[in-house]
């Protein structure tokens, strides 16, 4: 179902009481059909279709990441612990670039992301690497 911008400027009323505006609720159908008791419009809180959220599409790379099938402690070692195993796994991962891009965009401060430690990512952001 497509919506026009004017579709969400209506106010929802129930028994002549103001319930609020639907300006930010595209999933609420205030159409006149079907009607409920006493001919009042029936509200539906269920959308006609489900769209994949943009964030979900962007994060689908995580399902293909090799680290998803590995012990997370390798990627989040204790202070002073070795990061060698995690970096080795990252080298063969098909989503390494997407992982690093995500970590840089979301300012991930802990763990190995895209084959780089937090310190290495900071240096990369500053242009040192």
Swiss-Prot record:
InterPro entries cross-referenced by the UniProt entry: 4FE4S_WBL (IPR034768), Whib (IPR003482)
Q: Does the keyword Iron apply?
A: yes
Q: Name the coenzymes or cofactors required.
A: [4Fe-4S] cluster
Resulting phenotype, residue 99 to A: Required to complement filamentous phenotype in depletion experiments
GO cellular component assignments: cytoplasm
Binding of [4Fe-4S] cluster occurs at: 67, 90, 93, 99
Its annotated function is as follows:
Acts as a transcriptional regulator. Probably redox-responsive. The apo- but not holo-form probably binds DNA. Affects the localization or efficiency of septum formation. Complemented by whiB2 of M.tuberculosis and whiB of S.coelicolor.
Q: Entry's PANTHER family?
A: TRANSCRIPTIONAL REGULATOR WHIB, TRANSCRIPTIONAL REGULATOR WHID-RELATED
Q: How does it assemble?
A: Oligomeric in native gel electrophoresis.
Know the name of this protein? Transcriptional regulator WhiB2
